[in-house]
């Protein structure tokens, strides 16, 4: 049975197209399943029954056919992880006791269960999952007369008892709306028979039931996933006149520079995932070494101000370029006198702030 079920599922997977493994979040699904179950352990816990089975006249049929329906709600499906709540109703099958080839007793079980199902996508369209929950199981006990095999209604009983339910399995999305699954499920300590003549005495017979099932489910609301628009990129550049921001030849911010920098910070703060680059420049007056040092110190002063306002230190850089990239070009080449030259070269003394990020 197991090999056949696995072969059918694998064959289906080979012919299937790739789809999302778990259902989309906040959607429902419903399905059916069937397979083979087996009763375990409980029969060996009853000394009288165990002794009887040692005789060749007795036989215990533990294997059974199982089937059920289920429905679920997909709570989460993010980063390959999924979480769903699943409700189902199963016929968990029946065990039969025979004596001399005739039916002696039957133990039948069916009921509803509620479980949480956690899943992980291991391949495109393929999930492995585990379930844990509780099942309310009705167990019916039927007995038959020794002589003619007719049912003995006086001994018959039924109980309703909660049992732990656990399962592991794999699920494959053949289509976004259609999935197949193969799982192994087990119930713990099912039923507890009490004879009619001694209702306060429980026979020590409460097996657990394991079953392997193949199922198919339909997923509602599995249209194409909404396309998330890529964030719009934003690039902004600000140029600050150093004569307004700094004293000539100095790297300390002037008091009046605060208003200008606060205005720039207001623009920066509107950019998400931002990266800020501060570049300092000087004019050509003075040595190259001094100009590079001064431009670096000015860039650092501006960057430190923005960090103090709230820009992450690892999201901002400061670089001094000295007299590189002058904006005046050859405009001031014919200017005579130091004061006049300083005034003409004022546009070269600047701090540029480049901001890149998203809206």
Curated annotation (Swiss-Prot):
**Location (main, coarse):** membrane
Q: Which GO terms describe its biological process?
A: cell adhesion; monoatomic ion transmembrane transport
Q: Where is the OmpA-like domain?
A: 233-359
The record's section on SUPFAM superfamilies has: OMPA-like, OmpA-like
Q: What does this protein do?
A: Acts as a fimbriae subunit, allowing adhesion to host cells.
Which HAMAP family does the record cross-reference, listed alphabetically? OmpA
Q: What is this protein called?
A: Outer membrane protein P5
What gene codes for this chain?
A: ompA
């Amino acid at each position: 049975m197991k090999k056949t079920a696995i072969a059918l599922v694998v064959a289906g997977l080979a012919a299937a197209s790739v789809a999302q493994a778990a259902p989309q979040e906040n959607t429902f699904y419903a399905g059916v399943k069937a397979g083979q179950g087996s009763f375990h352990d409980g029969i060996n816990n009853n000394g009288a029954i165990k002794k009887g089975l040692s005789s060749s006249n007795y036989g215990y049929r533990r294997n059974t056919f199982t089937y059920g329906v289920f429905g679920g709600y997909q709570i989460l499906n993010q980063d390959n992880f999924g979480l769903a709540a699943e409700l189902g109703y199963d016929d968990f099958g029946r065990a039969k006791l025979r004596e001399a080839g005739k039916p002696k007793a039957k133990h039948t079980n069916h009921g509803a269960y509620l479980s949480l199902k956690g899943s992980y996508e291991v391949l495109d369209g393929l999930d492995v999952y585990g379930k844990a929950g509780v099942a309310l199981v009705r167990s019916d006990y039927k007995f038959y007369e020794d002589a003619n095999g007719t049912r003995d209604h006086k001994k018959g009983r039924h109980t309703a008892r909660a049992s732990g339910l656990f399962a592991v399995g794999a699920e494959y999305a053949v289509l976004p709306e259609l999935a197949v699954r193969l799982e192994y499920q087990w119930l713990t300590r099912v039923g507890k028979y009490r004879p009619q003549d001694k209702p306060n005495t429980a026979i020590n017979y409460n097996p657990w039931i394991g079953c392997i099932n193949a199922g198919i489910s339909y997923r509602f609301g599995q249209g194409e996933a909404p396309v998330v628009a890529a964030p719009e990129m934003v690039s902004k550049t600000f140029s600050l006149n150093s004569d307004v921001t700094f004293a000539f030849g100095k790297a300390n911010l002037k008091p009046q520079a605060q208003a200008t920098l606060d205005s720039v910070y207001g623009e920066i703060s509107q950019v998400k995932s931002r990266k800020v680059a501060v570049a300092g420049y000087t004019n050509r007056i003075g040595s190259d070494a001094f100009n590079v040092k001064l431009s670096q110190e000015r860039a650092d002063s501006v960057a430190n101000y923005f960090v103090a306002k709230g820009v992450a230190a690892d999201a901002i850089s400061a670089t001094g370029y000295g007299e590189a990239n002058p904006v005046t070009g050859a405009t001031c080449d014919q200017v005579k006198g130091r004061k006049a030259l300083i005034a003409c070269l004022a546009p070269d003394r600047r701090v540029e702030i480049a901001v890149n990020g998203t809206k």
